[in-house]
Amino acid sequence: MDDYRYRDNYEGYAPNDGYYRGNEQNPEEDAQSDVTEGHDEEDEIYEGEYQGIPHPDDVKSKQTKMAPSRADGLRGQADLMAERMEDEEQLAHQYETIIDECGHGRFQWTLFFVLVLALMADGVEVFVVSFALPSAEKDMCLSSSKKGMLGLIVYLGMMAGAFILGGLADKLGRKKVLSMSLAINASFASLSSFVQGYGAFLFCRLISGIGIGGSLPIVFAYFSEFLSREKRGEHLSWLGIFWMTGGIYASAMAWSIIPHYGWGFSMGTNYHFHSWRVFVIVCALPATVSMVALKFMPESPRFLLEMGKHDEAWMILKQVHDTNMRAKGTPEKVFTVSHIKTPKQMDEFIEIQSSTGTWYQRWLVRFMTIFKQVWDNALYCVMGPYRMNTLILAVVWFTMALSYYGLTVWFPDMIRYFQDEEYKSKMKVFFGEHVHGATINFTMENQIHQHGKLVNDKFIKMYFKHVLFEDTFFDKCYFEDVTSTDTYFKNCTIESTTFYNTDLYKHKFIDCRFINSTFLEQKEGCHMDFEEDNDFLIYLVSFLGSLSVLPGNIISALLMDRIGRLKMIGGSMLISAVCCFFLFFGNSESAMIGWQCLFCGTSIAAWNALDVITVELYPTNQRATAFGILNGLCKLGAILGNTIFASFVGITKVVPILLAAASLVGGGLVALRLPETREQVLM
């Protein structure tokens, strides 16, 4: 078998002229253009002359002459790297000029609306599990630990997806990897609505999280490469609005769908498709629509130029120019660019010997090659010349996520705590009551019965909710068709009593004494108690929290290019830290909702500025990788914030408030050490 030579995403180049050499073995592909239309065969001129692209035959002859020089290795790796860096700097300035010529118009806005759906999918993913859990826990009989793992697994998936898919986007392309991310998210999110078991549901949400975790880094890197310097800060901030729109969408859909228990069906006794599963499918729609729409958008020309694909990049830039000019009513305006500088390509050859003949062995070599390149690229971001910027950004991303996600979980938990305290304050206590021969068929709620005596009483088709019988004597009583939530019998004596078709299981009797009592045909299903939360309030709190960021988003978008990224980050984080101290006065549900809206509204500007400066600080071949690393650290901060802040609910408000404020102040001050990128071209 002939040896197989693999070059990872790179093509040969001619060092003397800097043009991209496409796949020279297929000249017909290079020769397709509308420019040559109408020529006779004898007079036909190669289309590349109009674009500044050499004829493939000339390229072949030059490469044949140069082959010995490359084989001899006259220029070392360091020389090639130096030339490449010089080429990249020239390309950055030329590309900025080209984007200015292309203008900002219909093409960018079309791409904008495609990408906002991808960002919405990311925002939805944060909320979908928390909204579905109150209903899903009953179907799947989830304990507190299982519910906690379900919330954690989504963030772990998003963290892994940001690392892996962000790195792949710098090697395989923005569009390709973003499509892959959205496909993974949409397919596994939809699949999770159909699976019945907890393990399968957990796995689907993990893979769905991996898919959506890669979207955020790629979306910002992709869109930034179609924007000019004057438009970049503002329009990336407009893009950031739609992350929070995902929260609004999820809240509205949960409010509209989940309470409708009839929106479902059953197949036999083992398969149930309830309304919360419909909600999960609806939440996968933004990713699905974005994935389909993305098929009609081109790859980033800046990425293609980085890969040395000059002609493909030129055609896309011409498409951007022509689309915008037609929309402005000047279709006659000609795209004047004929030649774009492309960086020297650092070829990597992987030789596969004839013994490596099976498809999976070749696939494994390709996989290991790409993995090594992604890993090396990530190390370059962390340990190369950008290490100080990466370290500072890591601190800012982490502290921002720790405080923001920690508080956004703490707010609804505190609201539930206030609800529980108010509920307990209305508890009725009955002491020493004696009831004989009564038939009870109504709901008993929020009561404590102590040292009572119930003789020959019947409890028929009734519901116990938050009821405690303590040191109570039951004699010749009868319980039938009884359901209960958070109801217990403690230190009771139960004599000659029958329990028929009830959910009063063994664990609900604590240190009780049974004498000649029987349990007949107990209710089947889950033996756990589940709280009936005020779903309306939960959805309303999330809806208002997401809606409150809209003013902050608009202000940050309008001021991003005027005051700069650093002032926006530092100012927003410091103001948010001050807002944290107002939480000491949040002693009611309404006050806590109000302070939540204020905090979210002031902190969003820092998030937008972080997205913009992260995109601008790194070159094209590290942009998505660095963004993915930092976004992965953000999800780690979110996990720690959720865990730490939730543990202090009902214990103290001091620790969460001081921790959030200190994190925001520290991160805001550290951010001021970053370089300002407002006037910087995109490298």
Curated annotation (Swiss-Prot):
PTM field: N-glycosylated. The N-terminal cytoplasmic domain is phosphorylated by CK1.
Transcription regulation listed as a keyword: no
Database matches in SUPFAM superfamilies: MFS general substrate transporter, Pentapeptide repeat-like
Region (Disordered): 1-72
Entry similarity comment: Belongs to the major facilitator superfamily.
PANTHER family the UniProt entry points to: SYNAPTIC VESICLE GLYCOPROTEIN 2, SYNAPTIC VESICLE GLYCOPROTEIN 2B
Function: Probably plays a role in the control of regulated secretion in neural and endocrine cells. (Microbial infection) Receptor for C.botulinum neurotoxin type A (BoNT/A, botA); the toxin binds via extracellular loop 4. Restores uptake of BoNT/A in mouse and rat cells that are deleted for SV2 receptor. Glycosylation of SV2B is not essential for receptor activity, but enhances the interaction. Also serves as a receptor for the closely related C.botulinum neurotoxin type A2; glycosylation is not essential but enhances the interaction.
Protein name: Synaptic vesicle glycoprotein 2B
Organism: Rattus norvegicus (Rat)
Lineage, broadest ranks: Eukaryota, Metazoa, Chordata, Craniata, Vertebrata
